Amino acid sequence: MITKRIIPCLDVKDGRVVKGVNFQGLSDVSSPVELGQYYSDSGADELVFYDITASSEGRRLFTDILTEVARTIFIPLTVGGGISTLDDFDRVLKCGADKVSVNSGAIRNPRLIFEAAKRYGDQCVVLSADVKRVDGVFRVFAKGGRENTGMEAIAWIKKGVELGAGEVVVNSIDTDGVKRGFDLEMLDAVCSAVSVPVIASGGAGGIGDFVTLFKTIPRVDAGLAASIFHFGEVTIPALKAALKENKIPVREV
């Protein structure tokens, strides 16, 4: 049986891990290197590193901190933020990333997904979609959730997978940092539309939200969270123990 993955997320701004609510009001949390090592040692299955202002500021992702994080951890690392070209893929992979997450860059140039999958393999290409309800319709947002693209989210995610994305991270702006549970309706729609692994992001407020996620939508492959892990509200060993008790398969800590 395929185990469910638990993935902490480091949202990095100016070299520090930050966290906000609904993609707004960012507050300083910790050093990405220290936090990355803590999660690697605590039983996290993977780590996600987002340079959250690279796209909106029109610059390339910070590679010095990324290299240090990659050297410190012993779990797979997915990296995103400001990824617009194959050169960007090369740069972060050389820093030690295992997978590269594309978002705004792929919206501007969808062929980037195809070219990257062809060069590195689809297992290396992660499509990250920031999604919000607008008048009852799931819409894709770009530039760290600041810009409504007008694109319908499910159609865009399907297109990204058809172009070669081997995994999808669905970030719910509506539930981000609110801690009232994952957006199950949106995740169910995405899982029904694609056959690649889907990672749920945004809204985890406690262990019960992960149990509900995996029980309600078994096709979801992984749960990603930030606040509850960063502030010690939930530890990964405790979360995995609870999932195991609920007969949800996880990798042993």
Question: Where do the language-model regions lie?
Answer:
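Glycine-rich, proline-tolerant flexible connector loops at the mouths of alpha/beta enzymes
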Residues: 46-64, 104, 169-181
